[in-house]
Amino acid sequence: MENQESDEPMQKKPHLLDSVSPNSMARNSSPSHPIAKSVSFFDCDFSLLCLRLVDYEIDVDATVLQLQNQKLVQQLDLQKKQLYDVESKIQELQLNQTSYDDELISVNQLWNQLVDDLILLGVRAGANQEALNYLDIVDKKRVPPCAADETFLCRLLQVDSLDTSKSDEVVRKVEEALALRHSSTMELMGLFENTIDTQKTKAESISQSLHAVKSTEDATIQLSSINDLMKEESKNLREMIDALHVRHKEHSEQIQAYISSHSTDQSELKHLKGQLEEIKAELEENRRKLITLKMQKDAACEGHVTSPAIANGSLSPEKPVDKTKLRELKDSIDEIKIMAEGRLSELQASQEYNLSLSRQCQDIENELKDDQYIYSSRLYSLINDRIHHWNAELDRYKILTEAIQAERSFVMRRDKELNLRAESLEAANHKTTTVGSRIEVLEKKLQSCIIEKNGLELETEEAIQDSERQDIKSEFIAMASTLSKEMEMMEAQLKRWKDTAQDALYLREQAQSLRVSLSNKADEQKGLEDKCAKQMAEIKSLKALIEKLLKEKLQLQNLASICTRECNDDRGLAEIKDSQRKAQAQAEELKNVLDEHFLELRVKAAHETESACQERLATAKAEIAELRTQLDLSEREVLELKEGIKVKEQEAEASIAEMETIGQAYEDMQTQNQHLLQQVAERDDYNIKLVSESVKTKHAYNTHLSEKQVMEKQLHQVNASVENFKARIAHNEEQMKGCFSEAYKLIQEDRHLVISLETTKWEVADADKEFRWLKSAVSSSEKEYEQISRRTDDIKLELDDERREKKKLEEELMELNKELEELGSESVEAAIVRLQEEVKNCKNILKCGVCFDRPKEVVIVKCYHLFCQQCIQRSLEIRHRKCPGCGTAFGQNDVRLVKM
């Protein structure tokens, strides 16, 4: 551009150049070269040199030179104005292009955000893994090898390049691509609407079934079906979480690849910076050489030029040589000026690019450090809503468990009362059996009395026939009347005993029915408790998974935002220049088309956002109404359950009143039968047996209590060890968190990325090993607890044997004491010295073989050598771990504690 503009004034005015010598052309050609921004120091030096040479060699009229100079200055001003106008237009076009690109990027981001929102909403609504397949479409899109200003359209059309000559075809293709994308989003919306409708139908069916429930059995069946549905939903959620975890791993691998490419790009940038510094040094050396050459040339010209030749207007004999040298110098200086200007412009552009990159990095760091940015993120809000939902369900299940526990205490009291009454019924049954045997004896006596009565009647008839005495008749009549009265009394008593026996049988049947109902209720209670425990465990596992996913997603988002922006911004200088040239050439052609297309996109985006907001409002209102209806239904169910509980309590009170009346009747019967029971001698024997059995049961109860206390102590010890292991695990988790924070800090430093990642991997592996070792220790402690419980039984058996042996040893001690008394004092002292030496040897054996101070606490499993814990800890800190005794290599898992 600049060379063409500098050649135009030379072609327009040939008559001025003909009247001037070639040296004047050389002088006038230097101001005809326009510069857009500023004139460097080479122009000033060259103009001074040319003026001096021309003043010494050429005698030209001052007026002609002034006119030529004025015209050339005017041309230069015009060209500068034109250049300034062109630059202002280019800047305006660049600003429009950047604003257009920013708006396109924002529209694309909003579109992608809408698609992601729809996918996650479908996941929350209970969609299958088909919803996540839409994410693959976005992941599979690659960056096309085209200009920077055409990347969005190329990615939209999925084409490597665009033909700018046919703008109508480009617009048509863009419209088709937008229609396809709109249709895909509408399909996604339809899929999610279907899933939401299915969920609504499920909820309505559940609510209808709950309304139709009339008995407790139906309620339990419905609750089991609801639990099955909840399990299916939890399985779906787990599958979706696993799929997201797989995607998370893929993205982490891509991020690592981006980090490696970023490190290579930075090394290339450093290499280019070194080359730039070398080129700068070469330019400075060339400038110094030019200055020295100019000084030498000035000195040579002053020595060779003479004054008379200048006065007469003739030239010196060395003029052609000076002209050629001047032309060569001028050409070389022009080339050097062009190279210097190009290098300076490249350096300025690279500096501006680096400044923009540093600003973007600072903005990214500020956004990442800002907590509000994290709290306002979409993923954080979704996870927070999910956590609130699970917390609400937790509270609901806690309330249910508390109500069940309250009912449990009531049921336990009722169970105790029924057990007491059952025992009293058993005692009454025993008494009724004894009374029944007594009744049978009395019936036999009655039959014998009836036989005697018949015999007496026959005898009286015979006596009446034999004798006619009135006294004997009266006596026999009195005897018969007394016998009849006694018979009636005995029959009345028999009827009473039969009625009491029937009542006792009826009470026994009622007690059995109550026991069956109690057992059924206890089974139901256990089932509900198991279900509650399972649901609590599932909730805890889901919470732990959610927390892990939160942490990993936050780290991945930070890394992805850093890497993607740095990788997208790392372009070469040549690509940027090519893209700028193409953008300047295509700006005028695409301006009108892009403005219209941009207006259409804006209108469509506004309509779509309005429709999406209205749909979200409608869905939110529908969800609120559904939740309100569910609340009303739950309140009604609670009221119905309370009424049923009240009815059951009233029935229980009525049954208790009936039992009390029966007990009172039974007590009345006992008062009536006390006279008969006093005559029974077997009662005393039975009481003696009961006393002996009660003594035996008390003794067994005391033994069970002692065993229970021992087991509780062992459980406390095991719980203490488990708590210690939990504390170690928490400490290890804190160490893991610290390692992650250090790794995140080290990621920001580009030089130490690989080292920091390797160290964190090793630390994580060690922590996993320690965690596994702790798990194995917990399992071993559980096994030890089982072994201890077995050993206690063996020890109890051994105690009896030891007691017997103790008696034998005591007898032997008595004999030995007698022998020692017989022995002298010298032999006793010698034996004491020997025993002391043996004790010292035993103590030395129990001490560590490295330090000889501390006792042996740790064993190495490979060689079974014993040492103290501190000496082994020192060897564990060393990388090459060897046994101090035999030199065999061992690992951290080969060291075990030993109780001496």
From Swiss-Prot:
Could you give one GO CC term from the UniProt record?
A: HULC complex
**Record carries keyword Coiled coil:** yes
- SMART domains xrefs: RING
Q: Which CDD domains match?
A: RING-HC_Bre1-like
> What does the sequence similarity comment in the record state about its family?
Belongs to the BRE1 family.
Disordered: annotated segments = 1-31
The record's EC number reads 2.3.2.27
Q: What does this protein do?
A: E3 ubiquitin-protein ligase that monoubiquitinates H2B to form H2BK143ub1. H2BK143ub1 gives a specific tag for epigenetic transcriptional activation and is also prerequisite for H3K4me and maybe H3K79me. It thereby plays a central role in histone code and gene regulation. Forms a ubiquitin ligase complex in cooperation with the E2 enzyme UBC2/RAD6.
| KO phenotype (gene knockout) | Plants have reduced seed dormancy and several pleiotropic phenotypes, including alterations in leaf color, plant architecture and flower morphology.
> Which residue numbers delimit the RING-type Zn fingers?
848-887
Q: How does it assemble?
A: May act as a tetramer consisting of two copies of HUB1 and two copies of HUB2.
Query: What protein name applies here?
Result: E3 ubiquitin-protein ligase BRE1-like 2
What Gene Ontology molecular-function terms does this entry list?
A: protein homodimerization activity; ubiquitin protein ligase activity; zinc ion binding
What's the encoding gene here? HUB2
Q: Which UniProt keywords apply?
A: Chromatin regulator, Coiled coil, Metal-binding, Nucleus, Transferase, Ubl conjugation pathway, Zinc, Zinc-finger
Lineage top rank: taxon: Eukaryota
Recorded hits in Pfam families, A to Z, give: zf-C3HC4_3
InterPro entries according to UniProt: E3_ubiquit_lig_Bre1, Znf_RING, Znf_RING/FYVE/PHD, Znf_RING_CS
Q: Which GO terms describe its biological process?
A: chromatin organization; innate immune response; leaf morphogenesis; protein ubiquitination; seed dormancy process; vegetative to reproductive phase transition of meristem
Catalytic reaction equation(s): S-ubiquitinyl-[E2 ubiquitin-conjugating enzyme]-L-cysteine + [acceptor protein]-L-lysine = [E2 ubiquitin-conjugating enzyme]-L-cysteine + N(6)-ubiquitinyl-[acceptor protein]-L-lysine
Q: Print the miscellaneous field.
A: HUB1 and HUB2 are involved in the same processes, but are weakly or not redundant.
Biased composition of type Polar residues is found at 20-31
Q: In which pathway does it act?
A: Protein modification; protein ubiquitination
* Tissues/organs with expression: Ubiquitously expressed.
The domain-related comment in the record is: The RING-type zinc finger domain mediates binding to an E2 ubiquitin-conjugating enzyme.
Q: Which organism is it from?
A: Arabidopsis thaliana
Q: Where does the record place it?
A: Nucleus
